[in-house]
Amino acid sequence: QDLIYKGDASAWLKTAYGLKARYTMRLINRSTDKQADLNKVLDYVSKSFTSADDEAAYAVYDANNINPFFGYFDSRAGFANSQSLTDKLIERKDPRLERVMLSPTTADKKRVQVTGSADKNLVPAPNGTPEQNMQKYGVSAFVYSNTAPTMLMSYHELKFLQAEALCRLNRTSDAEKALKEAVAAGIAN
């Protein structure tokens, strides 16, 4: 039973090329011909996903069958957005601050999406040894959805791999374009 692609062999072939890109890049420092292997990464990426619609997402969760990552993070008190991460996102005007940061609100223990660096709900955990209370500090939206799919391979990961390969090949303008596409795809996801 194929719970990801429902038996679509061409979709699995695209996923296989994406995984080849991932693991070729993962082993790049052991390569005897880095330039050739970086070009292989680019070739594999070109044969893989063309949009987020293609990505390998295990999307079978519901109220009775929660995402295991959510279960893991929700059952532990020590996960929160750190002060240092939050400061870096603010300093760099990183759009992920508004997209992925959730902060606690009132006693109802619901979360709200942060609207920016001036948002009074932006409550990062202090660096060091903060109180272990996930309800007190902000968390990533990606760990706060019990029905979010588990990604085997995402489109934005491929775009990041493409950007890294291009950068290592000193094709900086192409790398910058791929990086911007990767960030946009990741935020949209």
Predicted regions mapped to residue ranges:
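Structured, solvent-exposed acidic/aromatic patches
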Residues: 1-161, 165-188
